[in-house]
């Protein structure tokens, strides 16, 4: 289910009340028919004056740039591995960039030393392994084949493998199924090192 204007306003109010930075993010898969929706959504976000908007799809960048008040960040799914990519996103007007989680600490340090942009890294969380239009929850538990899904997307759902690993399944606002890694990425031991490096 797509968030309403009231949902976004409520979230923004809670964030501001907590004294935190407000940031919105886009999905990494955008269909042609969804471009108009995001164009309107950027207008709404601009009115809310977020600190940053994280862009995960190349096609959304030109739409977002039309809204000059938005500080756009090239997010992790844009595969930022090298200095040329950072230079490209600076030329596109990015306010910052999120590095690929596949980089080594030495590679991160090098990019920080040559980057024209402020950089971020993912520190804690599960990486996405797969995304699909096919929804396991809706198909098996929500009677999706009857025409209207009754599955509660907030209900915890997992896939298991032969080693008994549990892969969390989450559903986005467009009913896409996202399968996450069974193990969390954790760089908490390197937080101080990263901060000293300038991330």
Predicted regions and their residues:
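Active-site pocket-lining/capping segments in soluble small-molecule metabolic enzymes
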Residues: 1-88, 92-199
């Amino acid at each position: 289910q797509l968030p309403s204007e009231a949902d976004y306003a409520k979230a923004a109010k809670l964030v501001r009340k907590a004294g935190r930075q407000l940031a919105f993010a886009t999905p990494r898969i955008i269909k042609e028919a969804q471009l108009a929706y995001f164009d309107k959504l950027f207008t709404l976000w601009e009115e809310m004056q977020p600190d940053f908007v994280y862009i995960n799809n190349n096609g959304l960048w030109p739409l977002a740039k039309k809204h000059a008040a938005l500080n756009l960040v090239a997010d992790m799914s844009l595969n930022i591995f090298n200095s040329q990519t950072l230079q490209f996103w600076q030329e596109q007007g990015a306010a910052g960039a999120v590095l690929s989680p596949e980089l080594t600490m030495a590679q991160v340090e090098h990019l920080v030393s040559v980057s024209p942009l402020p950089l971020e890294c993912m520190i804690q969380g599960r990486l996405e392994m797969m995304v699909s239009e096919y929804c396991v929850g809706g198909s098996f538990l929500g009677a999706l084949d009857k025409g209207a899904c009754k599955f509660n997307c907030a209900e915890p759902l997992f896939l298991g493998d032969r080693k008994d690993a549990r892969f969390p399944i989450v559903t986005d606002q467009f009913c896409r199924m996202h399968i996450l890694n069974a193990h969390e990425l954790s760089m908490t031991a390197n937080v101080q090192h990263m901060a000293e490096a300038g991330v």
